[in-house]
Amino acid sequence: MTRINNRQWVIFGWFLVSSLIFSAILLGPYGVLFRDLIWRVVILGGFVGISVVILKKTWAAYRLWPAFMITLIVYGVIYQIATFLPGINNSPFTLTWSEGSAYYFASAYFSKQIYGISIDLPLINPTRHLLMAIPFIIPELPIWLHRSWEVFLWLMVTGLTIFLLVRRLDITNRLLRWTVIGWVFLYFYQGPVYYFLLISIIPILWGFNAKNLTKTLLLVLVGSVWAGLSRVNWMPVPALLAAAFYFLEVRVDQRGWVRYLLTPLIWFVSGVAVALLVWIGYAQWSGQPPGNFGVYFTSHLLWYRLLPNATYPGGVLLMTLLASLPLFGVIAIQLYRSGFNYHIIRHLGIGIILLVLFIGGLIVSAKIGGGNNIHNLDAFLLILLVTGVYLYFGKAVPDSNFPEREPFKKLTNIFITFAVIIPLLLTVDQGRPRILPEESRIDNALLTIQEYADEAAADDGKVLFLAERQLLTFGEIEDIPLVPEYERMKLMEMVMGDNTSYLAKFRQRIENQEYALIISEPLDDKFKGRSVPFGDENDVYVAQVSRPVLCYYEPVKDVFKFPIQLLVPRSPEDICS
């Protein structure tokens, strides 16, 4: 083994061990002492400083700035991966507000085998739950394996997407190539860009060919099928990504701008049409009432979420600008270097795509239920990324071969530094220690729920799991028939979308005291307003769900530490007027 390889092993070993120690400090039991970002940055700064010194001492050829950037990216990537690990555990209870719902929705694809009845397919994120359903092929796998599978999906799909994108850049320097891969990984997670959405663009990243437009059209259609099954606002994204590659790689030449635009227009119209047809087809096939899919268009818009607020202290607009301005700076410098040597139609094409996705992302972020991060700006951030790296690495094809201007190297490095630091800080600010209840508490909680459910079901009473329905999915609560209606997350969607017919049926069943037992999160009848995170969501849920339920049902048992509340019908004299 040569000396340089020995050095590489020393550097690799140090970075791996030290970054794992850093992750363990923030995510382990002592992480509760370092919840504030400032303390996390101080700890990170200490590790990074030592690592840069070791890198310089071990490999003197490294200049300080590249060594600093590489070090930041390595720590960020390993920490981001480490944040997934506390979620891989065997606790039967939901780890986040929506996690248990996700496993229940995934089980819908195998509902006959699991519950003995067929239930409606998922309304929310069908493709995510389709991917999450794969482990259900093997019956009775423990929940920790299902959790491991989703972590694998996050890392595998994101990694494949990044690999295909970076491959298009033809970066010959191996170290630079891996550095870019690591940076794009951090960039994607600042949204985050969800893995099940990325699958729709993988065909375009893999096979876009400016010289084979028919093949590209087929790839756009394939991606659009998946996009149509995934989310309404991602229907045009495969076509828009192909159009972005087209504007970056294909000259206008002598064809004229009308003929030039015809190709991306065909892709766009065809892709959106296919995605829309698939979405309509799934709505009909899923078993859901068609009106349920309309809630995405009737939800209230909370424009204040675009500015700093209790739900998202940074505000969607400011955080999006923060995440995107470094790349805009790099793009502006590269365009200046080229003498803006791209036809105005190509400028407008990319600009209009970015503007449409930016405005669309802001509108979706303002919908009630959203606005707590910038994940709805994912498509905007994606196209911006592609544009930036194509220009920076010289993959964009200018319309003529004018000499390049002198680069603003120092200014470019400043923008690159911020492009690394901003997603790194957003990454380090995520992830907290996950302290699970003791095994005895978990067993007692399950025993309590089982006893109350058995008693309620003894006389053919219905047991409604508003929350924690995955306890039935994974057999933690046994011999209790599934009541498929009114799962909490779907119920919240109907509340936020003001689906009056759905909510009227729910209220009628509650008034009729149709359920012998309701298992829910602790219900509160207090309005909280916008001074608390997700205050608007709380208030509509209180008005449409909590108050009607508490009027006709009374809590009989609170299962603390999880938290879970068991409710039974009130006696006639106790029902509110």
Give the predicted meaning of each segment:
Residues 55-67, 166-175, 208-214, 250-260, ...:
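Membrane-interface helix-boundary motifs at transmembrane edges
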Residues 369-413:
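Hydrophobic/aromatic-rich transmembrane helices and adjacent perimembrane loops
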Residues 1, 7-8, 71-73, 265-269, ...:
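Signature aromatic-anchored transmembrane alpha helix within multi-pass, membrane-resident enzymes
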Residues 23, 79-134, 141-155, 185-196, ...:
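Transmembrane catalytic cores of multi-pass membrane glycosyltransferases
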Residues 1-83:
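Start-transfer (signal-anchor) and selected internal transmembrane alpha helices
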Residues 281-287, 422-575:
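Extracytoplasmic
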Residues 148-181:
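Transmembrane-helix motifs of polytopic, lipid-linked glycan transferases
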Residues 46-51, 157-165, 199-211, 222, ...:
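Transmembrane alpha-helical segments
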